């Protein structure tokens, strides 16, 4: 493929006109604060987790050896199978992510600081079709930066929970809360018609720092006031632990993201931001759409990887915008169908940063 930047941008704009499902990984949060990333979480777990005795202690020792040996957190946590140790990891993870989120909630939600997704969400929501004004966002992130950004933009959003001080999961009720009655002309008279507001439907497929589940797993609630501090007795944060064992946990909590499965299965395109392709249970549906069904997609992320390359080779219309590895200066590579072996190199450009991508493309 004879590709230049103008042609690439035209391709991207064509994909974005399809109103893509937005997939947001931790890279988007790290653009605001690196503490949202796995390396900083690994350090916090290393410092803070106090394992129990017996197999708990043995498994945690293997995790620490792996981390000290240079393994990433996801791989290191493969050693964890004990429920008690998983709960300790969730407790520390939730408290740590909540503490970082707390540093930003006011500044981002009031617009004092412009979050990295601010411009992107503005463009996507403003471009929603009136016949289906819904922007689906799928994220494995525990933090609430997407929610804060929507608040700053005054964009209505729902994560599937009802309204209230403590909210229950009810997607039907949540969607209905996005309806507004309008008076529309019908011949010589007017008729009241229910219309959806342009809004975001947020699918938090690994749970969230403001989700809580009771110990017998019969109730799932969202409570923003309980984000800071430990959960009440008999409750724990509803978060799927990092590590590849999350596939098993996801299977046990499939109802959390059944709506995400539906959004992915019906997507006309995907815009994938700061995502590491480490979640098989989510990616299965995305890959089916991109590879088996010829759906279009764009990956915008800092790090080029063999995983991204493999997906592009197997897909008919998947593109990646990444930092040029080893360039030693601001430089972007654009890779798409037909030029995997010879990427377009954009010197003095940082289009892999979502803010710069939005400026150049949207």
Predicted feature locations:
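Conserved catalytic-core helix/loop/strand module for nucleotide-ribose chemistry
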Residues: 1-269, 276-278, 286-362
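Polyanion-binding interface signature
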Residues: 281
């Amino acid at each position: 493929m004879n590709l230049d930047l103008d042609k690439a941008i035209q391709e991207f704009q064509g994909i974005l006109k399809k109103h893509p499902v937005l997939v947001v990984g931790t890279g988007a949060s790290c653009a605001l604060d690196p503490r949202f990333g796995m390396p900083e979480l690994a350090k916090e777990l290393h410092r803070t987790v106090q394992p129990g005795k017996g197999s708990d202690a043995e498994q945690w020792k293997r995790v620490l050896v792996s981390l000290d040996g240079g393994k990433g957190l996801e791989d290191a946590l493969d050693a964890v199978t004990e429920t008690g140790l998983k709960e300790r990891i969730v407790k520390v993870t939730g408290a740590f992510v909540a503490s970082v989120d707390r540093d930003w909630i006011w500044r981002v939600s009031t617009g004092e600081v412009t979050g990295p997704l601010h411009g992107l969400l503005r463009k996507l929501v403003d471009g929603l079709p009136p016949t289906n004004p819904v922007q689906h966002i799928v994220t494995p992130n525990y933090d609430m930066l997407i929610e804060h950004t929507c608040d700053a933009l005054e964009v209505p959003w729902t994560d599937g929970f009802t309204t209230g001080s403590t909210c229950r999961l009810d997607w039907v009720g949540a969607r209905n809360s996005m309806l507004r009655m309008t008076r529309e002309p019908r011949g010589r008279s007017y008729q009241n018609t229910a219309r959806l507001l342009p809004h975001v439907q947020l699918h938090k497929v690994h749970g969230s720092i403001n989700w809580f589940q009771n110990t017998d797993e019969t109730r799932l609630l969202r409570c923003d006031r309980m984000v800071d501090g430990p959960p009440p007795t008999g409750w724990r944060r509803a978060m799927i632990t990092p590590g590849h064992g999350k596939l098993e946990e996801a299977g046990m909590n499939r109802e959390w993201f059944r709506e995400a499965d539906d959004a992915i299965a019906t997507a006309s395109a995907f815009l994938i931001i700061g995502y590491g392709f480490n979640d098989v249970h989510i990616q299965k549906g995305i890959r089916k759409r991109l590879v088996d069904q010829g759906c279009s997609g764009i990956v915008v992320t800092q790090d080029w990887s063999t995983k991204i390359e493999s997906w592009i080779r197997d897909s008919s219309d998947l593109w990646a915008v990444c930092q040029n590895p080893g360039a030693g200066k601001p430089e972007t590579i654009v890779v798409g169908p037909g030029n995997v072996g010879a990427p377009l190199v954009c010197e003095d450009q940082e289009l892999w940063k979502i803010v710069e991508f939005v400026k150049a493309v949207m």
